[in-house]
């Protein structure tokens, strides 16, 4: 009987710039894979935000982190993929048959913005729901913007990102790519 009720896979999209991907993002990804059958980590090109890392670099960093999650057994390869997008989020969700948008919330200020976005998205495509996941206590204050600022000023970011991401930040800032932080 359960097999008869089984519909097509529930696809979720976790969008972001991931500039860079942080431990907070990874926490949301791990938890989101428990909610949906297939999670697409959607890396926004979003040149308007002036990213430190190019889109292909951000996609590569996220893919590398997903490989680690898979290796650790936190998820499996069939449940997650990483794609870049540069169009309206709702159009992207429609193109991948997603029915859920995953968003992480750290603070009340996040909620206000995300609440407005969820309302706009619901108007654009009422069949796609937005699901909010509260940041874990240890991750509540992590933001990519703060990580870049700390890294740019020579601070230790190892409590906020994985070692490979920290190394990429160090390389960027050693080359003088500081204008975007």
Annotate each language-model stretch with its function.
Residues 1-181:
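Nucleotidyltransferase catalytic core that binds NTPs
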């Amino acid at each position: 009987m359960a097999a008869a009720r089984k519909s097509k896979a529930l696809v979720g999209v976790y969008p972001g710039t991931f500039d860079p991907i942080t431990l907070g993002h990874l926490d949301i990804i791990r938890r989101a894979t428990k909610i949906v059958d297939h999670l697409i980590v959607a890396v926004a090109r979003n040149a308007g935000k002036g990213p430190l890392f190019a889109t292909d670099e951000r996609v590569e960093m996220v893919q590398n982190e997903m490989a680690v999650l898979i290796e650790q057994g936190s998820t499996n390869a069939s449940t997650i993929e990483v794609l870049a997008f540069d169009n309206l989020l709702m159009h992207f969700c429609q193109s991948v048959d997603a029915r859920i948008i995953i968003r992480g919330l750290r603070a009340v200020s996040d909620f206000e913005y995300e609440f407005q976005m969820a309302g706009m998205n619901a108007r654009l495509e009422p069949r796609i729901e937005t699901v909010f996941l509260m940041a874990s206590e240890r991750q509540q204050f992590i933001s990519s913007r703060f990580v870049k600022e700390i890294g740019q000023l020579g601070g230790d970011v190892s409590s906020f990102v994985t070692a490979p991401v920290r190394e990429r930040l160090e390389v960027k800032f050693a080359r003088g790519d500081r204008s975007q932080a």
